[in-house]
């Protein structure tokens, strides 16, 4: 099966052409609730989950970003149903339940602002690739660590301490205190809308843009260079673009021909500027 390619078809048709254990990482934000009817198309999410399990490599990861709609004053629970489906029906492990906190929330008159979405990180057994991102510590945290003193001992060349008791046990905590960064939490705050999600104006022709930074950070976290990244609901093409920019291969499925035209423009502009070695093609034939 050809990679670095967008397939204009149902993702089940695309995955049917993939051998077992083919994909390293899937990053996607599927249509949900009433959006399940997507530009006139409907999706069988249970079979999608099962096929994703089949085509994912051992240790591979699926990042599934989803939210709930409120219907008749009650949230639909789509997010939780999805997590149960992937674990109990498809066979994935739920490796982490992460939160995407949006800095631009929509107001509501009867409840607090809904400013987050779930990011379920499913894995096929233990993840084979984990590159945890780091961020700067807060000013308060840095001040607290500066005021802390280590256990008595002799300072070593690498900055750590050696216990006085002669056990040769190095105090890693002391060395870690000198570090001004820490591993990020599983709550990621990202701006969205306007020029925050992307600077590609054509992408805004899609009703729900996947933020580039969000796709970028998951791709870095759960894959390595030259790995294969898949998005079964490619939308405006963000996952493919960020895979290219991070020197990963990609495959995308997008059932809407209208949205495929958006993807084609974004990928060609990105590929021509950064990675001329990547050849992007749109396919309207299921067998190509």
Protein language model annotation of sequence segments:
Residues 276, 280-288:
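Acidic, low-complexity intrinsically disordered tails
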Residues 1-262, 267-270, 288:
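Core catalytic lobe of class I
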């Amino acid at each position: 099966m050809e990679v670095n390619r967008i397939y204009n078809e149902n993702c089940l048709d695309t995955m049917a052409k993939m051998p077992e254990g083919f994909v390293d990482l899937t990053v996607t934000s599927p249509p949900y609730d009433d959006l399940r009817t997507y530009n006139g198309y409907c999706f069988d999410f249970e079979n999608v989950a099962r096929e994703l399990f089949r085509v994912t490599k051992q240790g591979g990861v699926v990042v599934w970003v989803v939210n709930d709609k409120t219907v008749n004053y009650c949230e639909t629970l789509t997010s939780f149903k999805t997590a149960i489906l992937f674990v109990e029906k498809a066979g994935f492990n739920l490796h982490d339940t992460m939160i995407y906190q949006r800095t631009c929330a929509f107001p509501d008159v009867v409840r607090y602002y809904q400013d987050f979405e779930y990011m379920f990180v499913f894995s096929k057994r233990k993840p084979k690739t984990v590159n945890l991102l780091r961020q700067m510590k807060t000013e308060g945290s840095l001040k607290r660590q500066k005021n802390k003193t280590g256990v008595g001992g002799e300072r070593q060349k690498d900055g750590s301490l050696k216990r006085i008791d002669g056990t040769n046990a190095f105090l890693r905590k002391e060395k870690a205190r000198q570090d001004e960064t820490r591993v990020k939490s599983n709550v990621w705050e990202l701006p969205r809308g306007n020029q925050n999600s992307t600077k590609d104006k054509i992408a805004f022709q899609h009703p729900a843009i996947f933020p580039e930074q969000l796709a970028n950070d998951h791709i870095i976290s759960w894959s390595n260079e030259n790995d294969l990244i898949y998005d079964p609901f490619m939308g405006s093409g963000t996952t493919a673009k960020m895979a290219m920019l991070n020197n990963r291969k990609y495959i995308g499925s997008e059932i809407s021909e209208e949205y495929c035209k958006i993807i084609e423009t974004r990928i060609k502009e990105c590929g021509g500027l950064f990675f001329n070695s990547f050849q992007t093609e749109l396919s309207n034939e299921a067998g190509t």
